[in-house]
Amino acid sequence: KAADEDAKRAWRATLGREERQRSSVYTTTEVIVSAFADERVRSQTEDPSYTPPRLLDKRKNTLYLCAPLQEQERLHPLFSMLVQELLSYAYEKAAIKGALDPPLLLLLDEAANIAPIPDLDAIASTGAGEGIQLLSVFQDMAQVGTVYGKRAATIVNNHRAKMFGAGISDRETLEYISRVAGSAEFEQRSRSRAERGRRSMTEGDTYRDLAPANVVREHKPGSALLMYGALPMAKLDLRIHLDTRR
């Protein structure tokens, strides 16, 4: 198989490396393949019922990758590899036949833990044109920065829609929402009373933040703020996922 030949060439190239480089390659490889020490992992990945072409065969197919909290770190190299393999095939297919139809929904819940994708910023900016709809879920902006460093802002900006749930306590996230929402001009009136009882009123304009950090933090559970493209920010009431009413 072509994949086997690629693996053999990579192995021969590794053997020819300087000893310290070879040691580094071995260490990285051990981390990546450690998940395959689990018999359950080997049996599932050897199952021929899943391949990227079969998943994208125009039928209503779904691939779930999930792991309990204590296994996420061990399995995330495997999960990342599976997602990147799928994306590579999806981009190749789109390059030949045009945007995927039906499109591929790539839903990355706990995107920083389950299957961190190295080039998430590029996928966020180019995926839509190839028929790939990307939904990334992070706990807060701080988590994005921890995983992706300087590319964190690019990743967030490349997602056209951004939704923020209630109860946010991360300062960076609150400041981001307030800064992007901006401010608006409001009419302000003030009344005063002189010592002899005379009253006066003054009118003027003032600028106020549209989404002050404290107001965003105090949003009730079940609500969210939506930023979409150049549209004004909107407040949403969320529907419980078990509620199937239309």
Outline where the language-model segments fall.
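P-loop NTPase motor core of the ASCE superfamily
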Residues: 60, 121-125, 143-246
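H-loop/switch region of ABC-family ATPase nucleotide-binding domains
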Residues: 138
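P-loop NTPase motor domains
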Residues: 1-132, 147, 206, 211-235, ...
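Alpha-helix N-cap/helix-start and coil->helix boundary motif
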Residues: 72, 113, 141, 170-171
